[in-house]
A protein has these predicted regions:
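Glycan-recognition/cleft segments
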Residues: 71-97
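Extended recognition patches within non-cytosolic domains
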Residues: 15-48, 65-66, 173-192
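Extracellular glycan-interaction surfaces
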Residues: 1, 8, 12, 87-146
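Extracellular glycan-interaction patches encoded by glycine-rich segments
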Residues: 1-5, 150-177
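A carbohydrate-recognition surface predominantly in extracellular/luminal proteins
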Residues: 45-61, 83-85, 116-120, 172-177
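Short surface loop/edge beta-strand patches of beta-sandwich-type extracellular domains
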Residues: 35-52, 77, 106-112
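Short beta-strand segments enriched in hydrophobic/aromatic residues
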Residues: 58-60, 124-126, 161
Length: 192
């Protein structure tokens, strides 16, 4: 017999492929909804100034952008003009193209919009040339006005807010940040 206040713990395996993709989140006894899969990391001791390169593997679980601009990562708590964004956008016939935006330099790779899995990244050289990379394909470079980011800022991986704004709806793994500009050859990794 079940008495008032009794509860049953139920767990399910995590399934990352197929039509029933799921994740298991451990919660207490209070009923909850699925949390936004977002990680926040302090900038302090992780990033400050130029040059730098970011690379990570991304699997997006959609073929049409689910919101204005799903984020792989961006920054919060930074000074004016110091924001960094890497994610997916849509424009015209290209939906889900990889892009980066830092200090007024918006770079994109339209032809990789249809990829579900990819290695995505951005490189900012010491002389301020910026590009985005997706599965070994580099965008053209443009100069950024970005110089540094204050140490109280944060890196947000997988979305923009815990409320789900610009949520990725996908998986990010092997997130890497170098305090140097990688070569074109080093940016040539491909995820299939």
């Amino acid at each position: 017999m079940v008495a008032s206040g009794d509860y049953l713990d139920v767990t399910t395996p995590q399934i990352e492929a197929g039509t029933g993709a799921s994740s298991f989140i451990v919660t207490g006894t209070a009923p909850v909804t699925r949390a936004s899969d977002m990680v926040t990391v302090p900038i302090k001791n992780n990033l400050y100034n130029l040059p730098f390169t970011v690379l990570c593997e991304v699997h997006k679980n959609w073929y049409k952008t689910p919101n204005v601009a799903p984020r792989v990562f961006d920054t919060g708590g930074h000074q004016t003009g110091a924001g960094i964004v890497m994610g997916f956008g849509s424009s015209g016939g290209y939906d889900g193209f990889p892009y980066c935006d830092i200090g007024g330099s918006d770079r994109r790779i339209n032809e990789n919009a249809g990829l579900e899995k990819m290695l995505i990244g951005m490189r900012v050289k010491s002389e301020r040339s910026t590009c985005v990379v997706s599965n070994g394909k580099l965008s053209s470079e443009t100069k950024t006005k970005w110089e540094y980011i204050r140490s109280t800022a944060t890196i947000r991986i997988g979305g923009q807010t815990t409320a789900g704004l610009r949520h990725l709806f996908g998986h990010v793994r092997n997130f890497r940040l170098w305090h140097k500009e990688l070569t074109d050859a080093q940016l040539g990794e491909v995820v299939e």
